[in-house]
Amino acid sequence: MAYVLTETAAGYALLKAADKKIHKSSSLVEDLNTAEKVAEQFKIHRFEKFQSAANALEEANAIIEGKVSENLQKLLEDAKSDKKATLIVSEAKLGNAINKLGLNFQVVSDAASLDLQRAIKQFLPELLPGLDDSALKQMSLGLAHSMGRHKLKFSADKVDTMIIQAIALLDDLDKELNTYAMRCKEWYGWHFPELAKMITDSAAYARIILTMGVRSNASETDLSEILPEEVEEQVKAAAEVSMGTEITEDDLNNIKALAEQIVDFAAYREQLSNYLSSRMKAIAPNLTAMVGELVGARLIAHAGSLTSLAKAPASTVQILGAEKALFRALKTKHDTPKYGIIYHASLVGQASGKNKGRIARTLAAKAAVSLRYDCFDEERDESDDFGLENRAKVEGRLSQLEGRDMRTTSKVVREQPKVEITEARAYNADADSTAAAAAAAPTADSDDEESETEEVEEKKSKKDKKKDKKEKKDKKKDKKRKRDDDKEDKESSKKSKKDKKEKKEKKEKKAKKEKK
């Protein structure tokens, strides 16, 4: 007895084959080219209909993942008999899952079974009574759309895919623009080499080439729209005494074509940058307020989605982008990296070298909170007040570490100090003291301050001593490692020399024997 399990958009169909060895005969499968032959060979045994479109989507996803759903298990348990039967399925993963259930089926899933399934699905409406071709097509189309939406995980509110693609394209554009600009400067530099030293902006350089052409036209060309007045005068003066070679009209046309590409790329890059900035402010305004548009977009792109990044802890956000360095450090038992992509944030850049790690940790912690607010708060608007509030806290911490005011956020966002209203008290005349008594009284405040400074100095000295000890230990370890390596090299060289000597002696002995 042989059964064929066919999955449709309407439900599961279990077909009984007239020939139990049909999957082994390639000629029988090839003969199934008409509806009559298929109907003659297969009869409907059981049909498990899906309850709704959502149920159909669940069942389809279960088949793709190679899982047996409750409906399918129920269908197979009802169909099993005392004798062992053959069950032909289309998916190998599904076949393995059915085998694990321990039902009385010999599951088959090979190339011949795929051809059999193809023939059955071609004439499926003839095998299923009450289900016409148009209805089945409509169901299949609806299921395909549902599966597409499920796979894409599309959400109108959180379109972070746009950010991921935009930042990737922006990076590619930067690389292309740099390559084109370098090629253009080298090419036009043969004619006017002094221009590249005066004009560093690639887009402005390309626009000058398009406006001026050959350097002999510099004195007659108006470059006021491209350059400031002082730089324009320098360019015109340099053009008169330039050491470059002459170029033909054909050369100039090709250089101009490249310059046009650079100008177009620069304009599109600016447009794309503005688009990315607007998308970031719409999707993750608080993260943008904390780390900026580009760093925020790179973090989202590296994590894969805004949700994945929001679920990550602050420590992961801190070292995101430095995975290679992290695993290398863990492998070699060295210090792990302090920052990844977040290093390029403006707040980390403002910190001095010794405080960069601390600020990166603080910024990552506040950025993680802002991310969760952006991602999971259902009633939030597109304002960045929460992010600005957190940024003010990070700036306060930075000012504390650096020892100077480094706050840049507006005073409105900063936390206002609480004003406590106390009861009015009568003047206490007994608390008055004379100058002599004041001079005689010990200065407790100054003593406290001195003790505090001494404690701080002691802590610093202890830290410095620990650091020195650690450095000495590391140096000793490195020296020992070098000694061991040198020793191994010497031993290996001695061994190789010894082996060569033995081989030479053997050859000489062999040669002597042959002579004798």
UniProtKB/Swiss-Prot annotation:
Basic residues: bias regions: 462-482, 495-516
Comp. bias intervals (Basic and acidic residues): 483-494
GO terms of biological process kind: box C/D sno(s)RNA 3'-end processing; endonucleolytic cleavage in 5'-ETS of tricistronic rRNA transcript (SSU-rRNA, 5.8S rRNA, LSU-rRNA); endonucleolytic cleavage in ITS1 to separate SSU-rRNA from 5.8S rRNA and LSU-rRNA from tricistronic rRNA transcript (SSU-rRNA, 5.8S rRNA, LSU-rRNA); endonucleolytic cleavage to generate mature 5'-end of SSU-rRNA from (SSU-rRNA, 5.8S rRNA, LSU-rRNA); filamentous growth; protein localization to nucleolus; snoRNA guided rRNA 2'-O-methylation
Keyword flag Ribonucleoprotein: yes
Biased composition (Low complexity): 429-444
Main localization category: nucleus
Alphabetized Pfam families for the sequence: Nop (PF01798), NOP5NT (PF08156)
Superkingdom assignment: Eukaryota
Domain spans labelled Nop: 283-403
Molecular-function annotations in GO: snoRNA binding; snRNA binding
Alphabetized InterPro entries for the sequence: Nop56/Nop58, NOP58/56_N, Nop_C, Nop_dom, Nop_dom_sf, NOSIC
Name of the protein in its database record: Nucleolar protein 58
Originating organism: Candida albicans (strain SC5314 / ATCC MYA-2876) (Yeast)
Gene: NOP58
